[in-house]
Amino acid sequence: MAKIIWTRTDEAPLLATYSLKPVVEAFAATAGIEVETRDISLAGRILAQFPERLTEDQKVGNALAELGELAKTPEANIIKLPNISASVPQLKAAIKELQDQGYDIPELPDNATTDEEKDILARYNAVKGSAVNPVLREGNSDRRAPIAVKNFVKKFPHRMGEWSADSKTNVATMDANDFRHNEKSIILDAADEVQIKHIAADGTETILKDSLKLLEGEVLDGTVLSAKALDAFLLEQVARAKAEGILFSAHLKATMMKVSDPIIFGHVVRAYFADVFAQYGEQLLAAGLNGENGLAAILSGLESLDNGEEIKAAFEKGLEDGPDLAMVNSARGITNLHVPSDVIVDASMPAMIRTSGHMWNKDDQEQDTLAIIPDSSYAGVYQTVIEDCRKNGAFDPTTMGTVPNVGLMAQKAEEYGSHDKTFRIEADGVVQVVSSNGDVLIEHDVEANDIWRACQVKDAPIQDWVKLAVTRSRLSGMPAVFWLDPERAHDRNLASLVEKYLADHDTEGLDIQILSPVEATQLSIDRIRRGEDTISVTGNVLRDYNTDLFPILELGTSAKMLSVVPLMAGGGLFETGAGGSAPKHVQQVQEENHLRWDSLGEFLALAESFRHELNNNGNTKAGVLADALDKATEKLLNEEKSPSRKVGEIDNRGSHFWLTKFWADELAAQTEDADLAATFAPVAEALNTGAADIDAALLAVQGGATDLGGYYSPNEEKLTNIMRPVAQFNEIVDALKK
């Protein structure tokens, strides 16, 4: 039997799964397809690390490792929903919840000194940050706005904040001594096993990474961010935001960049509270309160210090004296610096641009902002859009073009695979990458506390990326632009390989060019304003940034993107949108039993997954399901049956009901497959007859508080009861499986 894997993840998409997946299972079964769940939630991944500490009933398999292997086979057909990329505070909260539920798992050690503690820390580090996507992404990325969604937005545009020509909003970024400026890059002419080592000024050698296996043709880079230069830059920006009377905000990616960015976040916190750290720094650092887990962790940790109240007062004075901070939650006093994972650059910058260049201040009012993006590799993209909006005003969703993306992602490409090669430097000296025969391939002078890192990209993914770009340009008729920076050593190497591999393809009649990220941004937004479309062909980080930036401006959200990963072994990975897992949506369910999560991303991914089954295995019924689902999705949009934000109006469960009805209607009416038409005729009839009652019942359950039985590890039975509250609807769906 053909199989589709549906991932069980976290937060809002997990809740939605309990409503939608029974429908998917029932419909897929009519085409001979089994839908199997694999648990890659944060809780599931934690438990998989400690099998020896669990009872037989509690043990779970390592679903992520199994899916990683499956992704390397032609049989893979995986639907991947958003999951938590855990920061340390989230990880600690999940551990505590699991312990309270009776799981004998250890605490996360803050300072691992014994072998046992080091082993525990290594296991938790495997779960921390963006631990899922790099394992599953054995292919490059093809993300685009489906035509149905684009058409819907033109009819029902989302709100775009007006821009003022006098806006003081800007991006602040380093102009020297950051990752971009210090990068060195090589292309290996033969396979090798290299070593990364640190040689201190006194001659002491430390092996940072003993064995890094590299293939022929692989691109390897090393670079370093100077801690002194970073601190000087940050102090300047704190003063600048204060002088200009605008909000101070930091935009990093502490989830995916789980080694470098929490360190940088700590520098930001210490720079903002420079006076507090000048006075109490030694004591704070000794207590592990260095800012890397955010201001909230510091304030919590102060409770165990004798003079904690005194230091807390100093932090409060620091907030009064410093520039106003951008707020995550004004009502609760949660600032941009409270939690490293609260403000993630790829989501926060487009949201700011969409909102007139404003973020929220402590009075819950919009205000101009200084957006701190310390490393300058990609900051210019956002500054270019800001300057364009200052000059030309906000974009118009009813007329603007689209910017699909082809992203280099496979096999942990570039920065998003750098975590195991990123190091905080302990002492002044040099870092060297040394070949097996002792040649120094890359070398940097370093100082204590600098962040040094290496990135790699294998040759096969680069070839596949170029091929995918040509294919998408040919199929769509759009120009394709490779976003590569001639000022960066890595990008210069990549550009030479792009030119080499483009020669392997028929590019006649295609418009394919290579531009710097700033030039490519300007070209793309000039074309957007003329209603023209342009494919952005980017590395891994810009894949992530652009597939939030352009969809948020075009569609109001990145969750409505079609995200396909053609796996290099021939399988398919279908990601549901490009957004996160929406913790605020869960909060609303807990308070009001209303889930505003929009499953449009799941609907789009599911149709592509069925289509993959048709194309790979000749399953024509799967193709009929896909076409009918696309039509049902378009009808859902046009009839405005997507979830509302307000309690008492349609929510995620209601939208699932209407999708099911429209899908059954389409299947009953189609003439390609008589069996499916006959199967779905009574289903459609039952859903149409009961529509008013089912819709009313789904609205009636809203309004009261709910108990999920856990946040990271909710109770199965409670979730099922909350997400499938109407027996009449459930019986119609479940009857299909019999």
From Swiss-Prot:
Record-listed NADP(+) binding positions: 83, 85, 133, 580, 585, 596, 598, 645
Top-level EC class: oxidoreductase
EC number: 1.1.1.42
GO CC annotation: cytoplasm
Reactions the enzyme catalyzes: D-threo-isocitrate + NADP(+) = 2-oxoglutarate + CO2 + NADPH
Coiled-coil intervals: none
Keywords: Cytoplasm, Glyoxylate bypass, Magnesium, Manganese, Metal-binding, NADP, Oxidoreductase, Tricarboxylic acid cycle
pH-activity relationship: Optimum pH is 7.5-8.1.
GO molecular function: isocitrate dehydrogenase (NADP+) activity; metal ion binding
Regulation (activators, inhibitors): Weakly inhibited by oxaloacetate, 2-oxoglutarate and citrate. Severely inhibited by oxaloacetate plus glyoxylate.
Binding site for Mg(2+): 346, 544, 548
Alphabetical GO biological process terms: glyoxylate cycle; tricarboxylic acid cycle
Pfam families: IDH
SUPFAM superfamilies in the cross-refs: Isocitrate/Isopropylmalate dehydrogenase-like
Function as written in the Swiss-Prot or TrEMBL entry: Catalyzes the oxidative decarboxylation of isocitrate to 2-oxoglutarate and carbon dioxide with the concomitant reduction of NADP(+). Cannot use NAD(+).
Record comment regarding domains: Consists of two distinct domains, a small domain (domain I) and a large domain (domain II). Binding of isocitrate probably induces a conformational change.
PANTHER family in the record: ISOCITRATE DEHYDROGENASE (NADP(+)), ISOCITRATE DEHYDROGENASE [NADP]
Similarity remark: Belongs to the monomeric-type IDH family.
Protein name as catalogued: Isocitrate dehydrogenase [NADP]
Organism listed in the record: Corynebacterium glutamicum (strain ATCC 13032 / DSM 20300 / JCM 1318 / BCRC 11384 / CCUG 27702 / LMG 3730 / NBRC 12168 / NCIMB 10025 / NRRL B-2784 / 534)
Gene of this entry: icd
